[in-house]
């Protein structure tokens, strides 16, 4: 059984880093990894939704993971999302991830066609078989994937010894309780919705993987510590403050990840490009909201850190 301790804590979802032509930038990718190392996070979740994976080629995703591992190996826990909407490419990415020495691979279910549970289980197990020495995390995000991880499907997947748990991004925190109960002490649940990090942790999640963590890692690290210290009143205040920031990050015409990249430029001096079409980049009309979001992060740090 894998040592699950290495997965506990704050694990930001890694952002795609592009050059001015919209191509993957190795240099900017490495700079973002170093930023996260310097902030003190537990690990990174690479090539997931926040990494714009569904708008990238297999080769793009390989390059990103190679650049991440060149900087992060031995310093951060790395979970590589490898799912594509076909089994062959997913298995290729799984083999590649294992060859680089990632800690775990993860997958969403196949999307568009509504497949029966036995087909989803086969898809996941086939991908896992391509990385036989690597831990496996199931990603439950039914509101986007259109497929929910049911108790019966999770029970079936627990027969796979490489399955270590679930990244749960469904909104009901009761789902976390369900997966914790089914998996027991030998498995881990990651909280997915950033707005309920506190609630998810209290329901049994041992860690969080989130798309807004990267804009404010210090705040999520502080929230994680407050939970460990059982200072739940302050933790609730901080969660409310974080949620206000998330409200700003999602209040623009441009896509949230484009906003976060602009916030990182303002607050951290990091330039990692924009977002890839069909995601909408930040517009000039968005600029006041972007500036307000960046300022709110700075103010919240001053208040809680």
Give the residues covered by each predicted segment.
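Active-site beta->alpha loop and helix N-cap motifs at the rims of alpha/beta catalytic domains
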Residues: 3-12, 17-148, 264
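Charge-dense, low-complexity intrinsically disordered segments
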Residues: 1, 23, 55, 59, ...
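Secondary-structure boundary/capping signal
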Residues: 76-77, 135-136, 165, 187, ...
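General structural feature for long, well-ordered alpha-helical segments within catalytic domains
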Residues: 25-28, 32, 60, 64, ...
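Structural motif
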Residues: 2, 36, 97, 155-158, ...
């Amino acid at each position: 059984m894998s040592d699950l301790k290495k997965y506990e804590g704050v694990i930001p979802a890694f952002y795609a880093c592009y050059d001015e032509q919209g191509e993957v930038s190795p240099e900017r990718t490495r700079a973002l990894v170093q930023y996260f190392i310097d902030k003190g996070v537990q690990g990174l979740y690479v090539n997931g939704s926040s990494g714009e994976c569904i708008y990238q080629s297999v080769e793009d995703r390989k390059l990103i993971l190679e650049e991440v591992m060149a900087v992060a190996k031995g310093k951060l826990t790395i979970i590589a999302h490898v799912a594509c909407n076909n089994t062959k490419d997913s298995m290729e990415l799984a083999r590649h991830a294992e060859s680089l020495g990632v800690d775990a691979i993860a997958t969403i279910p196949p999307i568009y066609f509504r497949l029966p549970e036995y087909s989803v289980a086969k898809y996941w197990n086939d991908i896992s078989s391509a990385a036989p020495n690597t831990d496996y995390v199931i990603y439950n995000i039914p509101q986007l994937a259109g497929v929910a991880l049911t108790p019966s499907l999770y029970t079936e997947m627990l027969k796979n010894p490489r399955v270590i748990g679930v990244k749960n991004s469904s909104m009901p925190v009761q789902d976390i309780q369900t997966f914790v109960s089914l998996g027991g002490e030998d498995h881990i649940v990651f909280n997915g919705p950033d707005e309920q990090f506190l609630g998810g942790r209290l329901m049994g999640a041992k860690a969080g993987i989130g798309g807004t963590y990267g804009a404010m890692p210090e705040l999520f690290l502080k929230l994680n510590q407050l939970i460990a210290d059982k200072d739940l009143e302050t933790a609730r205040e901080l969660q409310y403050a974080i949620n206000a920031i998330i409200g700003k990050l999602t209040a623009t015409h441009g896509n949230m990840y484009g906003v976060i990249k602009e916030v990182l430029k303002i607050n951290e001096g990091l330039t990692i490009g924009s977002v890839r079409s069909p995601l909408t980049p930040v517009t000039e009309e968005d600029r006041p909201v972007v500036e307000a979001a960046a300022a709110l992060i700075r103010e919240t740090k001053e208040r809680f850190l």
